[in-house]
Amino acid sequence: MSTHAQANAPFNPVVLGASIAGFVVSVGIVLYMLNAQGHAAFNTNNDGVSWGLPIATYVFFVLTSTGLTFVASLAMVFNLKGFYPVVKRVVWLAVAALLGGFACLAFELGHPFRMLWAIPLSFQVTSPMNWMGVFYSLYLLLLLLKFHKMNANDWDSGSSRKLGIAALVAVILAHGNLGAIFGMLAMRPVWYSAQSPLYFLATAFLSGAVAAVLITYLAHGFKQENMSEGVRKLMKGAMPNVVAASLGAVILFVAARIYTGLWSNADGLEVFDAQLRSVWFWLELIALVGSFLVLLNRRLRGQGSVQILTAAAVLVALFIGRYEFVVSGQVVPLFKGSWVPGLIEYTPSLSEWMLVVLSLSVTLLIYAVGEKMFNLGGSPQSAN
């Protein structure tokens, strides 16, 4: 199938330069702190919060990659041709976000190179965490193969379609294992629920959708008039509708979790009362609900500036939500006693914040390289 080249804004070297600078600075600080202090550079420990901001960052980026694949699958798997004009760009960003999440996890493990041989040589077949790594690795490979097919103008052959379906299946399996890692921990009541994988599924789709909106505007200079007819039609029609619908579903999930947690008197769920006293929770809620109300207006949701602002607000809110989900599940002490505080205090260190910068920098750097090397605006001729 032939490829139709979309009209892209000129390559912006600012993204490439900023991502390189962020990568160099963040890696330098993290490596220095790890060399000087070891894992003590992170404000986590085995007595309380053992998974902190780095794990929340990892979850955020890999689930954003998952959501981007869901968005691309609307065209690749379910044949909604209106999404084809952004599929190639979205698939490449999914690869970049996944590698950004892996980079954060590698440094959080304490020794970023030891895992290359330690994990394969200590294969734990009964561990969801182990299979999460296997399926995410398979998912990455399938994404790269699918992108190679698209880059070679093979969009809809039998093998290309099978790769798209296989990538979707692999990421669902990886996503299910990631949700199970949290949802199967009975000693952590905030996480322990069959709802956890479903919550991850809904928020992953939303984060992928808003990331697709932001990267599309970035590629076109944040102006709809720079877009091709196919991209502009998508951004004025189906895409904001998809964002609004998925945002409404996520708000219901958040409301259900909070309401259930506040109503229940089960030990360990008192953390939901503490969340209501958190400024971050209210910022998250205001960003989600406010964006949803704005997108309900048909006239407003078609405007580029509104889409950019709401997408950015929702993406930040989802990052806050990932942090709250990961950390709040651990702040209730497992072992009670008069010497144990009601809730464990945790504040991310500079090294942990630098891993956020590292993940974002890796993601944008890989995306910028792809923007420079490939025609990310290409789409099948039949979709235009």
Regions found by a protein language model. Give the residues of each.
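Membrane helical hairpin/interfacial module
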Residues: 49-116, 128-131, 135
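Membrane-interface transmembrane-helix boundary segments in multi-pass integral membrane proteins
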Residues: 14, 34-36, 55, 130, ...
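N-terminal signal-anchor module of multipass membrane proteins
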Residues: 1-67, 71-74, 381-384
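Long, contiguous internal "core" modules enriched in hydrophobic/ aromatic residues
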Residues: 3-11, 20-26, 81-82, 120-129, ...
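TerminUS-proximal long segments
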Residues: 305-311, 315-384
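Alpha-helical transmembrane segments of multi-pass membrane proteins
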Residues: 19-40, 103-109, 173-181, 367
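Hydrophobic alpha-helical transmembrane segments
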Residues: 62-70, 140, 284-292, 359-363
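Juxtamembrane/interface segments at transmembrane-helix termini
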Residues: 34-43, 75-87, 109-112, 324-330, ...
